[in-house]
Amino acid sequence: MADEQQTLDQQTPEQPTGAAEDLTARVQELEEQLAAAQDQALRMVADLQNVRRRAEQDVEKAHKFALEKFAGDLLAVVDTLERGLEMSDPNDEAIKPMREGMELTLKMFDDTLRRYQVEALNPEGEPFNPEQYQAMAMQESASAEPGSVLKVFQKGYLLNGRLLRPAMVVVSKAPAETPPSIDEQA
């Protein structure tokens, strides 16, 4: 009987050790699954925040640039009024009332465009900026810095800082050096 008790004592501690190892392995496996689930949950929360942020940005851009097509269409009207004023004689008494009406209409258009963050680009004398201006021609000029805008054919416009229409310009270039004449060479 003592032998049986001793055998039982020897077997009993080993069984809990095997079960403990199984439980430890199971706990470790569950902890890994929990960590993976927590990581996945964090990623999903981050993805949701990114989607929400992108949606808010899209709505903001839609509000900001909803007027783009409409404002672009109005620019032709502004251009026509400006050309009409340029072509008319300010000293002609017969058209003075019509000219004043055109000036007031143009001022109202300009004020309205400014109210909706449509900004005119009139770059005469400024350095050429290919992101905002379109060069229609190059002209030699001794008085202007090479690469600067000499003349504006058509003003450009920005809507909330974004290019709506580039300014059509003439850009200056350095005068060509004249070759020495035959008399100078001799």
UniProtKB/Swiss-Prot annotation:
Signal peptide: none annotated. It holds the Pfam family GrpE. The keyword Ion transport does not apply. Residues 1-20 are annotated as: Disordered. GO terms for molecular function: adenyl-nucleotide exchange factor activity; protein homodimerization activity; protein-folding chaperone binding; unfolded protein binding. One of its GO terms (cellular component) is cytosol. One of its GO terms (biological process) is protein folding. SUPFAM superfamilies: Coiled-coil domain of nucleotide exchange factor GrpE, Head domain of nucleotide exchange factor GrpE. Residues 1-15 have a biased composition (Polar residues). CDD domains: GrpE (cd00446). The keyword Plastid does not apply. It is found in: Cytoplasm. Disulfide bonds: none annotated. Keywords: Chaperone, Cytoplasm, Stress response. InterPro entries: GrpE, GrpE_coiled_coil, GrpE_head. Homodimer. Belongs to the GrpE family. Participates actively in the response to hyperosmotic and heat shock by preventing the aggregation of stress-denatured proteins, in association with DnaK and GrpE. It is the nucleotide exchange factor for DnaK and may function as a thermosensor. Unfolded proteins bind initially to DnaJ; upon interaction with the DnaJ-bound protein, DnaK hydrolyzes its bound ATP, resulting in the formation of a stable complex. GrpE releases ADP from DnaK; ATP binding to DnaK triggers the release of the substrate protein, thus completing the reaction cycle. This is Protein GrpE. It comes from Pseudomonas aeruginosa (strain LESB58).
